[in-house]
Regions:
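Polytopic alpha-helical membrane proteins, predominantly small-molecule transporters/carriers
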Residues: 2-440
C-alpha cells in the first residue's frame, strides 16, 4: 500500500512539474509573435534587383551569425557542446529541421509571386493546424485533455487563421487579378510551405522531450538552414555566377538583411522555448500572431494602409480582435494532469529508446536543469566565447558602416514606439526565462 501511494505521489509530482511551465510558454510564444512580425521590417529597406533566393541567403547568413552568438552569450559554447554531446542522436534531426525551414521558405517565394502575399500568408499560417495534428499523433498532446481545453485550442487556432485571412485581405489595393494565371501553383506552394513548417516542429518537440536545450538545438538547426539556402542559390539562381556573389551593390544592402535575420532569430528562439513548454499545438497558433505585428509595422511605420478605405480599415479592426480572442483561447487552455501524464509517457518512450537518464531529462524538460548539471559546465566560459561575440558585433558594425537606406517615408514616432515594444517584450521574456529556468 505504501509503495503504491509513493508511486502515485511521484507520478502526481512529475505531472505537476511538467505542467508548471504553461505561463512561461505563453509569454515566450507571444514574444515570438512580436519579434517574428518585426523581422520583415528591415527588408523593406532593401530596394535591389537581387532575386528572392539571394535575399533569403543573405538574411539566413544574418540568422547564422545570430544563431551562434545568442547561445554563446547566454550559455557559452562549453555548455552548448556538452548538451549536443549528450544528445548526439538529435543532431541530424536539427539539421533536417533547418532544411525543412529553408525549403518551406523558398516555397513561400513562389507562393507570393503566384498569388500574392495577401492570399499566401493566411494559407501557410495553417501550419498551426498541421502542428496540432502532429502533436496529437506523435507526442500525445491534448490526449486526456478536457473537451473544454480541446475546444479552446482548436477554435483558438482556427480563429487565428481566420484573422490572418481578414488581415491579409485588408492589405489588398488595386487589381487583385494580377496573379490569376498562376493561382493553382501559388496555392500549392503555400500549402506545401504550411505542411513543411507544421512538420518542422516534430524535430523541435522530439529534441525537447529528450532534454535538449533550445539554444543547443538552434545552433545546429542553422547549419541546415544556411546549407540549404546556399544550395538553392547555386542550383536555381545562376550558380557561382549569381548576382549575390558579384554585385557591387550587395555590400550596401547586407546590413538590413542581417538585421532582419537577427530580429527573426530572437523571435524564433522565443518560439523554440514556447514549443518546449507548451507543446506544438499551443505554441504555433500563439506565435502565429506575428501577422498582427507585421501589419502594425507595415501600416503604422511604413504607411501601407494610408489610402485604405473604410472597409479595409474595418477588416483590420475585426481581424485584430478575432486574433486576440483566438490567442486568449489558446493561452488559457492549461494542460490538465491527465494530459501531463501523456507528455510524461512520451518523454519516457524517448528515454527508453535512446537510453537516456529519465530523471535528468525530466528536470531539463521542466526547466530545472541547473539543479542537475555540473557547476563547471554551467559557469565556465572559454576565451573563444568572447572572440565569437566580438566577431559577431564586428560584422554588424562593419555592415552598418557600409549600409545605405533608400529614401522611404517612415513614421518616426511609431518606429520608436514599436521598437520599444520589441525591447520590453524581450526584456520581460528573457527575465522570466532566466528567473525560472536559467535559459534551460
Amino acid at each position: 500500500m505504501d509503495t503504491k501511494e509513493t508511486m502515485t505521489g511521484t507520478a502526481n509530482r512529475d505531472a505537476e512539474l511538467l505542467g508548471s511551465g504553461h505561463g512561461l510558454g505563453v509569454v515566450c510564444a507571444l514574444t515570438a509573435g512580436v519579434w517574428l512580425g518585426a523581422a520583415e521590417a528591415p527588408t523593406k529597406l532593401v530596394n535591389s534587383g537581387l532575386s528572392p533566393y539571394a535575399i533569403s541567403l543573405c538574411m539566413v547568413a544574418g540568422v547564422f551569425t545570430a544563431r551562434w552568438t545568442v547561445p554563446t552569450l547566454l550559455k557559452g559554447t562549453r555548455y552548448v557542446f556538452a548538451d549536443l554531446g549528450r544528445n548526439k542522436h538529435l543532431i541530424l534531426n536539427a539539421i533536417l529541421a533547418g532544411m525543412l525551414w529553408a525549403v518551406a521558405n523558398t516555397l513561400t517565394v513562389f507562393a507570393i509571386r503566384d498569388v500574392g502575399l495577401t492570399i499566401a500568408f493566411p494559407l501557410w499560417n495553417t501550419n498551426s493546424l498541421v502542428g496540432i495534428l502532429w502533436g496529437r499523433l506523435l507526442f500525445g498532446e491534448l490526449k486526456g485533455a478536457s473537451a473544454k481545453n480541446v475546444a479552446k485550442v482548436l477554435l483558438g487556432a482556427l480563429a487565428i487563421v481566420a484573422a490572418a485571412v481578414m488581415l491579409g485581405f485588408s492589405t489588398i489595393h488595386g487589381d487583385s487579378s494580377a496573379h490569376g494565371g498562376r493561382a493553382l501553383s501559388g496555392v500549392l506552394a503555400a500549402a506545401g510551405a504550411s505542411l513543411l513548417w507544421g512538420t518542422m516542429y516534430i524535430p523541435y518537440r522530439k529534441a525537447y522531450i529528450s532534454g535538449m536545450n533550445p539554444l543547443s538545438f538552434v545552433t545546429v538547426f542553422t547549419v541546415g538552414e544556411l546549407g540549404t539556402c546556399f544550395a538553392l542559390v547555386l542550383a536555381l539562381d545562376g550558380g557561382t555566377k549569381a548576382a549575390v556573389f558579384h554585385s557591387p551593390e550587395i555590400k550596401h544592402l547586407l546590413f538590413w538583411l542581417f538585421l532582419g535575420g537577427f530580429v527573426w532569430v530572437i523571435g524564433d528562439l522565443c518560439q523554440q522555448f514556447a514549443t518546449k513548454y507548451l507543446g506544438i499545438g499551443r505554441a504555433i497558433p500563439l506565435s502565429n500572431t506575428n501577422q498582427l505585428w507585421g501589419l502594425a509595422w507595415g501600416a503604422l511605420v511604413f504607411g501601407e494602409l494610408a489610402h485604405a478605405n473604410a472597409a479595409h480599415r474595418l477588416l483590420v479592426v475585426a481581424g485584430s480582435v478575432v486574433m486576440i480572442l483566438g490567442a486568449l483561447a489558446v493561452s488559457t487552455a492549461i494542460a490538465s494532469e491527465r494530459e501531463n501524464v501523456s507528455t510524461k509517457q512520451a518523454l519516457e518512450r524517448e528515454c527508453s529508446r535512446y537510453g537516456l537518464d529519465s530523471a535528468r531529462v525530466l528536470a531539463a524538460y521542466s526547466g530545472a536543469e541547473d539543479r542537475t548539471a555540473t557547476r563547471g559546465e554551467q559557469d565556465a566560459r572559454g576565451w573563444w566565447d568572447y572572440v565569437i561575440l566580438a566577431a559577431a558585433a564586428g560584422v554588424f558594425v562593419y555592415l552598418g558602416m557600409n549600409a545605405q537606406a533608400p529614401p522611404l517615408t517612415m513614421n518616426a514616432a511609431w518606429l520608436w514606439a514599436l521598437g520599444a515594444v520589441l525591447v520590453v517584450s524581450a526584456a520581460v521574456c528573457g527575465s522570466r526565462l532566466w528567473k525560472v529556468t536559467r535559459f534551460s
